[in-house]
Amino acid sequence: MKKLLNYISFLSVVLFSVACTSSTIEDENAPSEVTTVFYKNADELAATYDPSNTVNQTLRNQIYDLYKQGKWSELESVFKVNNLNGGWPPANGGYNIVDNTDFTAGQKYDRYSGAIGTYSGTGAPTLGGNFTSPIINGYVYTFAQRALNKPENAYDFYYEIEVLNNLLPFKGQSADIIPWFGQVGKGKQTMWKIPLDPSTGYTKTWNKLAQEGYIKITIKKSPSGNYPSAVGMVIQ
């Protein structure tokens, strides 16, 4: 009886080991989530994280291979070890990139941010930035799917941006979101190629685009809790 129990125990260990090995092989051979590689080579991708051109070719090639294979945790580790891009991911945080997308009337997007400059809590905050997530058929991506670098309650504002017409004089770039900063990612993002404001020399703010009649902004939440009176405010 003792020999039988020992044999059963041995067999269980063997079967478990085989199952784990099989699972590992399946994971290694799983198809990449990256189905469209926007960057044609390692140097094109490097332009998104190495503007000073200091990263050697061997490391560039390694990063490019990990990016194409969708090995996000390994890629983030490489960035941390080599202190790259201030900790941010390459490719503006996106994969399966589609460039020069149009903005059409009725489309809605959302984002988290603070105000530009000092905000006293009176009047409309000045809101800037150019990365959003699309709201598709009413679906709002979770905070974790956005893979942002701060906790949700660190952001003063969560707001919705509605496109009012087909007249925006610039395009966008859409992508799936790279998992990063301990967040699951894999949501969708749209980068707005917003031009400079001649009066300031900086990228136009969302307020400026609203003033020009292209968009409407609605502040939905103050995740930080700092500005509850701003919730429901419409900037147009």
Label the predicted regions.
Residues 3, 24, 53, 96-99, ...:
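Intrinsic disorder/low-complexity signature
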Residues 30-94, 98-101:
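N-terminal export/targeting and maturation segments
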Residues 1-8:
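Bacterial N-terminal signal peptides that target proteins for export
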Residues 17-37:
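Bacterial Sec-dependent N-terminal signal peptides
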Residues 8-17:
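Bacterial N-terminal signal peptides
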Residues 72-236:
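Catalytic toxin/effector domains delivered as secreted proteins or via bacterial secretion systems
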